Amino acid sequence: MAMARVSLGRELIAGSLLAVSCAAGILAQDLASSLDTRGQSTVDGKTAPYLVRHLPVNAFPELPAAIQERLTRRGCMIPQTYEAHRPENVVHASLERRGSSDWAVLCSANGAVSLLVFLASGDGEATVVVTAPETSRLQMHAMSDVMGFNWAIDAATPEQIHEAQLDMHHPPPRVDHDGLADSVVEGKTVYRFFTHGAWTIVETQD
């Protein structure tokens, strides 16, 4: 009888743990779904459904706490491109000068997406480089008949920027610190560069 009670107790515990695990999984799925934006939009004269997936700020633990706090106060979520396989659109690079520790983030809030930059010299305050309606950054893709988000940012090293300028008749001197690669998925990339206290777009054509 004692062994039977022990066995029954173990089965009850195992069943309880399984139920808790399932409930946690369902809760995580519900939370992820609640961060998504869905709707219908018209692009190039065609109306289609869209889905934009977002991640919360705390999905990027590498972000300094002060920057996480400012993003949270803005109500930011981090939009993910339709081809994302890992968390993206948060960049750590030397954007102000060689060796500086700076951050760039795509912040989605209130239907708009802003490219925010936090320079190490800026005491944690954000510079808004560019803003666009989230629905203006949608496109169809081969993975689905639902439109997805197409805006991606990445660090661009001096070498990458130099390579992008090689087709110019007179390429300028190589820059001395990182820029930002601002891309449309499966489309054009422009390079944003901070110099003389302002953001510019790097020329890659004559």
Write out the residue ranges for each language-model feature.
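Bacterial N-terminal signal peptides that target proteins for export
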Residues: 2-16
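Bacterial N-terminal signal peptides
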Residues: 13-25
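Acidic, small-residue rich beta-repeat scaffolds with periodic aromatic anchors
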Residues: 22-58, 134-206
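Acidic/hydrophobic-patterned starts of short beta strands in beta-sheet-rich repeat architectures
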Residues: 97-107, 177-180
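Structural motif
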Residues: 111-117, 190-191
